[in-house]
Amino acid sequence: MFRYLLCCFGLVLMYPTGIDMYLVGLPQIANQLGATEAQLHIAFSVYLAGMATTMLFAGSLADRIGRKPITLFSALLFALASYFAARSQSSDLFLVARFVQGVGAGCCYVVAFAILRDALDDKRRAKVLSMVNGVTCIIPVIAPVIGHLIMLRFPWPSLFYTMAVMGLLVFGLCLFVLRETYSKASFHSQTLPRVQTESFKQGFFISRVVITTLGVTTILSYVNVSPMLIMGQMGFDRGQYSNTMAMTALVSMLASFSTPFLLNQFKEKSLILFSQTLFAAAALVFILTQLGWLGQLFNLLGFGLVCSGFAIGFGVTMSQALSPFVARAGVASSLLGIAQVCTSALYIWVMGLLEVSAINILLAILAVGALISITLMLAVPKLSEMVANEQIPESA
């Protein structure tokens, strides 16, 4: 099992690394390419667009030709796109490279979840996805620090050369360590008849898509508005802001790595409901601070509750969402990724157009998301009869 965990960790980490590592070099990139920082901030959206437009394609292909070929192609594509981003001489070429980089990262992200679905049973998968989430949570803190250290001695292209090396390392892992978890023979003889029964229209899958999507939208909204809340509203300087984000990342990591142990004591449903209760509690804290009933420093408690809620609930809910699928696990993973990326981007964009304040952007998704998610968890039970029919490869 270790080989699958190692490869999937590498595949998943390319997605957040591609977002966070280059930000520290944005002023230098803008200066050299003759663009403004505001113009290059679109590189974030372009990267996500690359992910979203290819996720479904990657999942469908992974269900047809296998997981390993897609991981090799995607990791190599990420490495090549990173190299060409480093060599860009204009902002247009840079944005094209960022789009392709997003394509590679998105494919890797989708196939990693499909591999874990193939290789692990329901209980182990929930624990592993929580651990994957814990490692992912520290990337937004570690990646900019690594980027800063690199730029102390090297120019901004070195950031993308580093990402290219990372892509090549993951390519090597997948080539020499990863074993194919998807059997064509098994597919045609056993799982092909199940395609008709593995419907994406079933209420259980849709409910888990909604819950995970609301969770991702919540955490990305928090990351997006955190500078305005922490530095603008609370009056922290940049150093204090960095320390605050580092502490919340630590909270996320601790909560994520605690989840596997909690799963030994509590049911998955209980943990998901608890995570949504933490979101609701965070909304209450923010309301009380805005009314003046609590001091502004209590916002830090709210931030911790947001991060803990996401860390505890996301991996478990993702595992439940994938559990009904054997023959179509790749496409299921794709649909989850597309819903999460597109909904998050749309929510933040619409709230920006409506000029909603930073605190209200976060409050709205916390309150509404918790209410909807708790309702769905209570109304739509887990499809245990489908999970009981899973066939896990012996190699796991």
Curated annotation (Swiss-Prot):
Which superkingdom is the protein from?
Answer: Bacteria
Task: Mark the transmembrane ranges.
Answer: 5-25, 42-62, 65-85, 93-113, 132-152, 158-178, 210-230, 243-263, 278-298, 299-319, 334-354, 361-381
MF terms in GO: transmembrane transporter activity
* Cell compartments where the protein resides: Cell inner membrane
InterPro entries of this UniProt entry?
Answer: MFS (IPR011701), MFS_dom (IPR020846), MFS_Efflux_Transporters (IPR050189), MFS_trans_sf (IPR036259), Multidrug-R_MdtL (IPR023697)
Q: Topological domain, Periplasmic: which ranges?
A: 26-41, 86-92, 153-157, 231-242, 355-360
Name the principal localization, coarsely classed.
Answer: membrane
Task: Please list the residue ranges that the record places on the Cytoplasmic side of the membrane.
Answer: 1-4, 63-64, 114-131, 179-209, 264-277, 320-333, 382-396
* PROSITE patterns named among the record's database cross-references: MFS (PS50850)
Output the Gene Ontology cellular-component terms. plasma membrane
Print the keywords alphabetically.
Answer: Cell inner membrane, Cell membrane, Membrane, Transmembrane, Transmembrane helix, Transport
Q: Tell me the membrane topology, using the record's own terms.
A: Multi-pass membrane protein
PANTHER family in UniProt: CHLORAMPHENICOL EFFLUX PUMP RV0191, PURINE EFFLUX PUMP PBUE
The UniProt similarity line reads:
Belongs to the major facilitator superfamily. DHA1 family. MdtL (TC 2.A.1.2.22) subfamily.
Q: What is this protein called?
A: Multidrug resistance protein MdtL
Q: Which organism is it from?
A: Shewanella sp. (strain ANA-3)
What is the name of the gene encoding this protein? mdtL
